[in-house]
């Protein structure tokens, strides 16, 4: 590139960054989107049910995938009150303290200057060609499960949606640890002795059934988003750890309808996708108070905890309430042309900036393949350990393959700030010694 062209390009990049810089008002708005009132829609009232008979009336406030499964008569949803999911003051304060320190680099997946908090709290702008990428960074450095947490158990059920037959049921445990950019739980701001410069790790272990018991998965994500994740699988019957090839994160996970890349809504790097912000609208998302839902003691938790019930066609749909939320519509197209999907559409909650409330997954032909939703409970209406944490609790999920008429559902018992999450749990050596 000639010097003049380089100068013009750098100038344009600088002007773009300046034009979309955040202000103190943006910080207030991003964490308090309902300060001036909750969204409304004609005919929508808390307590009502949206079903096949009336769904067309509410099509504009439903994610396309949600509309499809209701229109087919497979499920119906009950509308709840819109509520505030206030994030921890430590995260808000970190955002304010580090305002405008984070900048995008020249390539998708490049970020410099990020310390902690929400990196890009300004309202996304359709005129900003990288607005979608900024939202993706907000998700990566968001508070899905906080600095550290555990789910034990997560009950994963595989079903034939046409008949409701349970084909397989697994009991899993999941553990999450942020090594860097921590905002609340000691050690802050980072776990020491992190020579590999990891940002976050996920560790999973199968408890049941017996033929899969002690199968383990470890994902290590680097702070440098351009660096490929390290992923390892331990198969108990083989008693050996093997490293997963990159493409295996898009294989069916333990025979379910999920890929590893689907975890938490999206479990990949920012640089793995081309992100496009499609606009802001009000959409119904599954967000609720756990203690106010239809609950089941089917799984007989020894502590008396009751899980969100399933229902609808084939028992493929969680029985939680949905509330009208401000969302950012975000499209992600895989950079890898051999990826098994053509794109995902996320309806990102503007307050939490999580990606898992409502998602459509499209096949290589561009047709909807799966409808993916994770319902969140307000922490103050969940387990005592979660009260006051300010972390939306992933409470139940439904992954519905609308082409194959198959589903995978999940019920969580998640705990925030779980102390039995030592860094050693997230090392390969731990997998070998956990039999």
Where are these regions (language model features)?
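Beta-strand-dense domains in secreted/periplasmic systems and polymorphic toxin scaffolds
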Residues: 244, 358-359
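Bacterial N-terminal signal peptides that target proteins for export
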Residues: 1-7
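Non-transmembrane domains of secretory- and envelope-associated proteins
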Residues: 22-123, 238, 249-317, 325-326, ...
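N-terminal signal peptide c-region/cleavage motif recognized by signal peptidases
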Residues: 16-19
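Short, surface-exposed coil-to-beta transition loops
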Residues: 213-215, 227-228, 340-344, 356, ...
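A short, surface-exposed beta-strand/turn
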Residues: 220-224, 343-357
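Extended beta-strand-rich segments in extracellular/periplasmic secretory proteins, especially
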Residues: 99, 162-195, 199, 205-208, ...
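Solvent-exposed N-terminal domain segments of exported/luminal and surface proteins
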Residues: 22-229, 235
């Amino acid at each position: 590139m000639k010097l003049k062209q380089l100068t013009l390009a750098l100038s344009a990049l600088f002007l773009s960054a300046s034009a979309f810089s955040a202000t103190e008002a943006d910080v207030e708005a991003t964490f308090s989107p309902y300060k001036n009132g909750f969204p409304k829609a004609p005919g929508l009232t808390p307590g009502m049910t949206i079903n096949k008979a009336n769904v067309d009336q509410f099509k504009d406030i439903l994610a396309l995938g949600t509309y499809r499964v209701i229109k087919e008569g497979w499920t119906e949803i009950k509308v709840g009150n819109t509520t505030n999911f206030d994030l921890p003051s430590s995260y808000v304060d970190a955002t304010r303290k580090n305002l405008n320190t984070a900048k995008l680099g020249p390539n998708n997946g490049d970020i410099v200057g990020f310390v902690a908090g929400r990196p890009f709290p300004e309202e996304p702008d359709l005129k900003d060609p990288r607005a979608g990428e900024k939202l993706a960074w907000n998700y990566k450095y968001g508070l899905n499960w906080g600095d550290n947490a555990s789910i034990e158990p997560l009950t994963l059920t595989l079903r034939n949606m046409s008949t409701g037959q349970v084909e397989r049921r697994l009991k899993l445990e999941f553990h999450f640890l942020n090594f860097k950019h921590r905002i609340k739980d000691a050690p802050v701001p980072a776990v020491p002795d992190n020579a590999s410069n990891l940002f976050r790790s996920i560790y999973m272990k199968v408890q049941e059934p017996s033929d899969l018991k002690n199968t383990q998965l470890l994902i290590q994500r680097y702070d440098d988003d351009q660096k490929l994740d390290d992923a390892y699988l331990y198969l108990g019957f083989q008693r050996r750890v093997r490293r997963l090839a990159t493409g295996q994160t898009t294989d069916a996970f333990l025979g379910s309808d999920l890929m590893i890349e689907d975890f938490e809504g999206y479990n990949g790097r920012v640089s793995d996708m081309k992100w496009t912000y499609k606009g802001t609208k009000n959409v119904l998302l599954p967000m609720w108070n756990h203690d106010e839902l239809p609950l089941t003691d089917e799984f007989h938790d020894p502590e008396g905890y009751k899980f969100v019930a399933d229902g609808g066609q084939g028992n493929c749909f969680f029985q939680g309430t949905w509330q009208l939320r401000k969302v950012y519509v975000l499209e992600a197209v895989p950079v890898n042309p051999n990826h098994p999907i053509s794109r995902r559409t996320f309806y990102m909650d503007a307050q939490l900036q999580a990606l898992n409330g409502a998602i459509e997954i499209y096949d290589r032909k561009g047709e909807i393949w799966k409808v993916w939703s994770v319902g969140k409970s307000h922490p103050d209406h969940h387990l005592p350990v979660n009260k006051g944490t300010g972390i939306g609790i992933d409470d139940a999920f439904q992954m519905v393959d609308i082409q194959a008429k198959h589903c995978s559902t999940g019920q969580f018992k998640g705990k925030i700030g779980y102390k039995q999450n030592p860094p050693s749990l997230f090392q390969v050596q731990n997998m070998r010694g956990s039999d």
